[in-house]
Swiss-Prot record:
GO BP: DNA replication
Region called RnaseH domain (RH), residue ranges: 655-787
Organism: Duck hepatitis B virus (strain China)
Pfam families assigned to the protein according to its UniProt record, in alphabetical order: DNA_pol_viral_C, DNA_pol_viral_N, RVT_1
GO molecular function: DNA binding; DNA-directed DNA polymerase activity; metal ion binding; RNA-directed DNA polymerase activity; RNA-DNA hybrid ribonuclease activity
Keyword Nuclease: yes
EC number: 2.7.7.7, 2.7.7.49, 3.1.26.4
Upper taxonomic lineage: Viruses, Riboviria, Pararnavirae, Artverviricota, Revtraviricetes
Protein name per UniProt: Protein P
Annotated keywords: DNA replication, DNA-binding, DNA-directed DNA polymerase, Endonuclease, Hydrolase, Magnesium, Metal-binding, Multifunctional enzyme, Nuclease, Nucleotidyltransferase, RNA-directed DNA polymerase, Transferase
Region called Polymerase/reverse transcriptase domain (RT), residue ranges: 366-654
Renumbered residue ranges of the record's region Disordered: 28-60, 210-274, 286-365
Domain comment (free text): Terminal protein domain (TP) is hepadnavirus-specific. Spacer domain is highly variable and separates the TP and RT domains. Polymerase/reverse-transcriptase domain (RT) and ribonuclease H domain (RH) are similar to retrovirus reverse transcriptase/RNase H.
Catalytic reaction equation(s): DNA(n) + a 2'-deoxyribonucleoside 5'-triphosphate = DNA(n+1) + diphosphate; Endonucleolytic cleavage to 5'-phosphomonoester
Family under the similarity heading: Belongs to the hepadnaviridae P protein family.
């Protein structure tokens, strides 16, 4: 082929070949442009292509990719209807056809330690992020509440009781680790561990009163908010006829005190009995008992306390009546910080109505429940006796089926009428990661243990995140994993730590969620730095998962699912093999359900940057997913997908960005197109028909790429420069994307475009040239720009 750089190129064989390529490109456009401009060329009928005779298991991939792409534009895949179709594609299945979870009655609750980071971190790691984290706040616009009995999802219908029992143990473990509040009453919760400074103002302090009764001093005030009189205890002498000692307590609540032994929605039926009360009148009291509540610290409305030897009664005059109605609270209150409060004791005459275990404990005057390191908190909110999220258990992972993982479903805050718009945060894509990673440095990765449980919540926000095991209600004191706000908070948390680590230890640091990546040119220095970093974080109360931490500097590391060595990034070979196996099992002409296709596209998207393909090649499957219809693979389309997985490539870290000087320019009018070279050569072509100007411009740029193969091209079409061709026919868009992806396109105003003259039958003008790239610069955080 003669070089297209001379004045006489319009008379050469090159021009005739260019005309041939132009007609082929125009045929690709015209085959579907008139009918559907916005949809790919896919038949929606019943003419399902049958598999060819002797269809090979391994598709023929010896042909170049460009030939395979053109074959796929002729033998098109098909969209179908919404009738039932195949739900399995190799080892993949539709999202609603996933293998159900298997219940394991021997599940163990994993060890969960108290993750309480020291607020000294605000001084050690100065950052504006801490104002969003100490404490974090969660304010949904609207909330849907569910009954306590629905706290555990019916994931395992044959093992409901066992499932709830293990969930209860899991929540108890979280409570003991200081991650959950436990509901005592509408205004009172309890928690374990060390309180944060913003919780101190809501802590409830208990003081012993000489006569044996107990009152509570809240924020330094021991007075009744409603009546204004000081809290006091009035005891009546023992009456042998009644067999009970009545103790009157002042209530700080606006409403009468109700029994809270059933706090959290006990599933047992309430026991009704009559007791003799003040004034010789009988009042009917409904009390609920359960084996769980008998040993748990309970407070009625957070104000009435157990008092002395027998049941404490709160007596109030009822409006319009001449007798006193009394409500009985059988709750047992334990004290904070090891301080004991006399427990409730019930006379032998009344214990017959209680369960045997409860009666035996209640009759024991010497037994008092003591819990260490327990704090009572009356938050600046009410604590609802209902839940906002549901729970269930699954295996911890595919390799560890002996331990359980708690799944928290707060999906009401991310979809439906209560959906919230959570803040966006910077997350590196593959292109960014390639540009920020340093080349040729040893690396160490650190992993936070229980990362989300480092993030404390405001007590008022905790009341919006209520869960239950079916009996008791708990609230998340730390950020749960099932809320869309938690990843944003974790990003702020690790970013603040990473910035300080990079500054203090003079090491390149990158953080993503709970992963830290440290790089330094000297391996021995990096090894010592990693130990110092771990010590620094642990002194601040931040826990490191040493099982997932690199013990010493390495040259090849797995980070964010990629294999990263000193110069390149790649994907593990096992992942390629699995994907090729799935493609081999595609049956040409068979209908596949769109949910199954959705999973398949997810796997292809991850590996696509490491191939010579582009996203336009997957658009037919995206069309099936968008329209929720079945999909059928053609033989050529299956070959194309297999060809992509065979052309595996590694991506260079820190790719050299070159800005080549433009030597070729293109321009188009509705009827003519032109290509101009900086040496003065030019060629003018006549289109077969009039089309939209942006299509004519793209045709000329593709033709210039095919015939001249320049490193960059000048064009005055912003549509072409941005390389977003979704509105074009699928096969033409795929070919254009394939041709133009690896090269630079510069925008030049029409008045300065050298090819503007030849398209209007005038000589080209390269004297005054002004151009600019329109590609958006990749955002990189400032602290990572210097590497």
């Amino acid at each position: 082929m003669p070089q297209p750089l001379k004045q006489s190129l319009d008379q050469s064989k090159w021009l005739r070949e260019a005309e041939k390529h132009l007609r082929e490109l125009e045929n690709l456009v015209d085959s579907n442009l008139e009918e559907e401009k916005l949809k790919p060329q896919l038949s929606m009928g019943e003419d399902v292509q049958s598999p060819g005779k002797g269809e090979p298991l391994h598709p023929n991939v010896r042909a170049p990719l460009s030939h395979v792409v053109r074959a796929a534009t002729i033998d098109l895949p098909r969209l179908g209807n919404k009738l039932p179709a195949k739900h399995h594609l190799g080892k993949l299945s539709g999202l609603y056809q996933m293998k159900g979870c298997t219940f394991n009655p021997e599940w163990k609750v994993p060890d969960i330690s108290d993750t309480h980071f020291d607020l000294q971190v605000l001084n050690e790691c100065p950052s504006r992020n801490w104002k969003y984290l100490t404490p974090a706040k969660f304010w949904p616009k609207s909330i849907s509440y569910f009954p306590v009995q629905a706290g555990v999802k019916a994931k395992y219908p044959d093992n409901v009781m066992q499932h709830e029992s293990i969930v209860g143990k899991y929540l108890t473990r979280l409570y003991e680790a200081g991650i959950l509040y436990k509901r005592i009453s509408k205004h009172l919760v309890t928690f374990k561990g060390q309180p944060y400074k913003w919780e101190h103002q809501y802590l409830v302090k208990q003081h012993q009163i000489p006569d044996g009764a107990t009152t509570r001093k809240i924020n330094g005030r021991a007075e009744n908010r409603r009546r204004g009189d000081p809290a006091k205890s009035i005891s009546r002498p023992h009456d042998p006829k009644r067999g009970c000692n009545m103790v009157r307590q002042i209530s700080n609540n606006r409403s009468s005190i109700r029994p809270c032994a059933n706090n959290g929605g006990d599933k047992h039926s309430p026991t009704t009995r009559r007791l003799a009360c003040w004034g010789g009148k009988a009042s009917r009291i409904n009390q609920s008992y359960s084996s769980r509540d008998s040993s748990a610290p309970v407070d009625a409305r957070g104000r009435s306390e157990s008092a002395g030897s027998l049941s404490s009664l709160s007596g109030r005059k009822a409006a319009g009546n001449h007798h006193h109605s009394t409500l009985i609270n059988p709750s047992v209150e334990t004290t904070a910080r090891g301080r004991s409060t006399p427990g409730e004791q019930i006379s032998a005459r009344d214990t017959s109505a209680l369960p045997e275990s409860r009666a035996s404990r209640a009759c024991n005057k010497d037994s008092s429940i003591k819990e260490e390191n327990v704090w009572y908190l009356r938050g600046n909110t009410s604590w609802p006796n209902r839940i906002t999220g549901k729970l269930f258990l699954v295996d911890k992972n595919s390799r560890n089926t002996t331990e359980a993982r708690l799944v928290v479903d707060f999906s009401q805050f991310s979809k439906g009428k209560n959906a919230m718009r959570f803040p966006r945060y910077w997350s590196p894509n593959l292109s960014t990661l390639r540009r920020i990673l340093p080349v040729g440095m040893p690396r160490i990765s650190l992993d936070l243990s229980q990362a989300f449980y480092h993030l404390p919540l405001n007590p008022a926000s905790s009341s919006r995140l209520a869960v239950s095991d079916g009996q008791r209600v708990y609230y998340f004191r730390k950020a749960p994993m099932g809320v869309g706000l938690s990843p944003f908070l974790l990003h702020l948390f690790t970013t603040a730590l990473g910035s300080e680590i990079a500054r203090r230890f003079n090491v390149w640091t990158f953080t993503y969620m709970d992963d830290f990546l440290l790089c330094h040119p000297n391996a021995r220095h990096l090894n010592s730095i990693s130990h110092a970093v771990c010590t620094f974080l642990q002194e601040l109360g931040i826990r490191i998962n040493f099982d997932k931490t690199t013990p010493s500097p390495v040259t090849e590391i797995r980070f964010l699912g990629y294999q990263i060595d000193q110069k390149f990034m790649k994907i593990e070979e096992d992942r390629w093999k699995e994907l090729r196996t799935v493609i081999k099992k595609i049956k040409v002409g068979a209908w596949y359900d769109w949910k199954c296709i959705q999973r398949f596209v997810g796997h292809l998207n991850f590996v696509l940057p490491f191939t010579k393909g582009n996203l336009e090649m997957l658009k037919p499957m995206y069309a099936a997913i968008t329209n929720k219809v079945n999909f059928s693979f053609s033989s050529a389309y299956r070959t194309l997908l297999y060809k992509l997985t065979m052309g595996v490539c590694k991506l260079a870290i820190k790719p050299k960005s070159s800005v080549p000087l433009p030597r070729v320019a293109t321009d188009a009018t509705p009827t003519h197109g032109a290509i101009s070279h900086i040496t003065g050569g030019s060629a003018v072509f006549a289109f077969s028909k009039v089309r939209d100007i942006h299509i004519q411009e793209l045709l000329m740029v593709c033709l210039a790429k095919l015939m001249i193969k320049p490193r960059c091209i000048l064009t005055d079409s912003t549509f072409v420069c941005h390389k977003r061709y979704q509105t074009l026919p699928w096969h033409f868009a795929m070919l254009a994307k394939q041709l133009l992806s690896p090269m630079q396109l510069y925008f030049v105003p029409s008045k300065y475009n050298p090819a503007d003259g030849p398209s209007r039958h005038k000589p080209p003008d390269w004297t005054a040239l002004t151009y600019t790239p329109l590609s958006k610069a990749i955002y990189i955080p400032h602290r990572l720009c210097g590497t």
